[in-house]
Curated annotation (Swiss-Prot):
Keywords: ATP synthesis, Cell membrane, Hydrogen ion transport, Ion transport, Membrane, Transport. The keyword Cell membrane applies. It comes from Methanocorpusculum labreanum (strain ATCC 43576 / DSM 4855 / Z). Component of the A-type ATP synthase that produces ATP from ADP in the presence of a proton gradient across the membrane. One of its GO terms (cellular component) is plasma membrane. It is found in: Cell membrane. The lineage of its organism: Archaea, Methanobacteriati, Methanobacteriota, Stenosarchaea group, Methanomicrobia. Belongs to the V-ATPase F subunit family. Its main location: membrane. GO terms for molecular function: ATP binding; proton-transporting ATP synthase activity, rotational mechanism; proton-transporting ATPase activity, rotational mechanism. It is a peripheral membrane protein. Pfam families: ATP-synt_F. This is A-type ATP synthase subunit F. The keyword Membrane applies.
Length: 100
């Protein structure tokens, strides 16, 4: 399983420096929605990292898909956490609460 990161150039740069290979720069809402859809269809991606503010820019239909996604697990960074917490997402993906 791989980690994918989608966001503006500044957001993905840090992940590139950390060695994440699947990084996608999306500077406008249309490109963002297109790239998210592409990554959601990639069976090799286990975790998708997004900026919280980007979630507000995509269509509501895609937001619902992201909120209900088990694989890949969607992690949002920055601002208020959208939807479920990381703990809840991992619990849904793995089937076990790793914090207990």
């Amino acid at each position: 399983m791989e980690i994918a990161v989608i966001g503006n150039k500044e957001f993905v740069l840090g992940f590139q420096l950390a060695g994440i290979k699947k990084t996608y720069s999306a500077e406008n809402p249309e490109k963002l929605a297109e790239t998210i859809t592409k990554v959601l269809d990639d069976t090799n991606v286990g975790i998708l990292v997004l900026q919280s503010t980007d979630l507000e820019q995509i269509p509501r239909r895609l937001q619902v898909i992201i909120e209900n996604s088990v694989k890949p697990t969607i992690v949002t960074i920055g601002g208020q956490e959208a939807g479920l917490s990381l703990r809840e997402r991992i619990k849904r993906s793995v089937g076990v609460d790793l914090w207990k």
